[in-house]
């Protein structure tokens, strides 16, 4: 919430787990930057921190709400999701299943990116292929609207049988 890329946090753990967690932390980055920790402690305890958090909430709420509206408008018949109360992502599941990795290739060709959801599950199972994670933190509301329109087109094209005419009378190849 203050310095992008700075990761400061804490873990509450049993006394037995502590030495393992210390080794895990040390094996990843040795230690967190002390100046960063000092700055973070000062900032989160400052009188301006609550106002800063409210600005961030308003900023991301606008984008979340824009994505919710765009999803409803463009993907309401194709997918299901729950609007997040926190975080920066929507988890979307295609109603008729599918392979979001294959969709990603087509979406990237049209300059739209998302993360196939399968990578976030502990075991690779075909039923997880219908999930995707959509990030709303970087795009403007206008970009989100455009991105969801393109994504809906890509999903519909992907579902059209090869060589069959689609609703516009065009042949899918």
Protein language model regions, located:
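Short beta-strand segments
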Residues: 10-12, 83, 89-93, 116, ...
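PLP-dependent enzyme catalytic core of the Aspartate aminotransferase-like
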Residues: 109, 125-173
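Surface-exposed helix-capping loop/turn segments at secondary-structure junctions
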Residues: 51, 71-81, 159-163
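Conserved core segment of the aminotransferase class I/II
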Residues: 1-58
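Conserved C-terminal alpha-helix-loop-beta "cap" of PLP-dependent enzymes
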Residues: 17-18, 92-133, 141, 145-146
